[in-house]
Amino acid sequence: MSSLYPSLEDLKVDQAIQAQVRASPKMPALPVQATAISPPPVLYPNLAELENYMGLSLSSQEVQESLLQIPEGDSTAVSGPGPGQMVAPVTGYSLGVRRAEIKPGVREIHLCKDERGKTGLRLRKVDQGLFVQLVQANTPASLVGLRFGDQLLQIDGRDCAGWSSHKAHQVVKKASGDKIVVVVRDRPFQRTVTMHKDSMGHVGFVIKKGKIVSLVKGSSAARNGLLTNHYVCEVDGQNVIGLKDKKIMEILATAGNVVTLTIIPSVIYEHMVKKLPPVLLHHTMDHSIPDA
């Protein structure tokens, strides 16, 4: 099975590293001698030769810390990642990647109501499915980790397929305030794109009212398949829907060298937020940074 990578930069750097590993002459085994203890060797040799590869500064502390090391005294070969595991020599252990992850499969959550009898959730019907349109900040819906674009499959054991938004809200309204069992699929219309900032701190795209309108040729955004006519839903897992472009760019600027965007096709986004007052998106939507 082919290896998986969070970004094109990770794939290319790993290929270059593996080529160096294969080209390195194998040293013959030597008798064990009492020598001074040396620091554990890095698995990937000659990293300095890859400095500034694809516009990346590979000698940075972040990258050095993410590289796999051979345990001291271990003379056995180091095996590669297992099937389905990510290989990330550049991205490393990125919190943004983890926060933005769209998990496959379905999960069950237990929702409740606040002292006003509210869940903080607004739902919308799309293609016979029921989706999260709005999660209000500091509400039961935000506390259980529901996000914009999540699909609700069941509410208290009842299938939601074909329900109108009105029916769904009525079912939630009549449900118990202590426990509402909801089966959810993570954001099926959305996908994530992981990119790396260049020496100027840019990843290479332009937004207008939250929508990606152009890409910079040769940038990390272009290399990694970021698409125009898509809206930015999250930056490193933090919801940015409804925020001004200036605020979104500020969040991007303060992010690390690795940035993961969650995007959604404009036709789906515009249908989902239709008839939703912009003030709710800007001031009411949960824009907090989620737990990893």
UniProtKB/Swiss-Prot annotation:
Keyword Hydrolase: no
Superkingdom per UniProt: Eukaryota
GO cellular component, one term: Golgi apparatus
Keywords: Cell membrane, Cytoplasm, Lipid-binding, Membrane, Nucleus, Repeat
GO process terms (BP): cell population proliferation; intracellular signal transduction; intracellular transport; nervous system development
Induction data: Down-regulated by HPV8 E6 papillomavirus (HPV) oncoprotein (at protein level).
Any GO molecular function: identical protein binding
Annotated tissue distribution: Preferentially expressed in cells of the digestive tract. Low expression in skeletal muscle and kidney. Detected in differentiated keratinocytes of normal and malignant epithelium. In healthy skin, expression is localized in suprabasal epidermal layers.
Subunit structure, as described in the record: Monomer and homodimer. Interacts with SDCBP. Interacts with TM4SF1.
Annotated PANTHER family: SYNTENIN RELATED (PTHR12345), SYNTENIN-2 (PTHR12345:SF13)
Free-text comment about domains: Binds phosphatidylinositol 4,5-bisphosphate (PIP2) via its two PDZ domains. These domains target SDCBP2 to the plasma membranes and nucleoli, two PIP2-rich regions.
Function per UniProt: Binds phosphatidylinositol 4,5-bisphosphate (PIP2). May play a role in the organization of nuclear PIP2, cell division and cell survival.
Protein name per the record: Syntenin-2
Encoding gene (name): SDCBP2
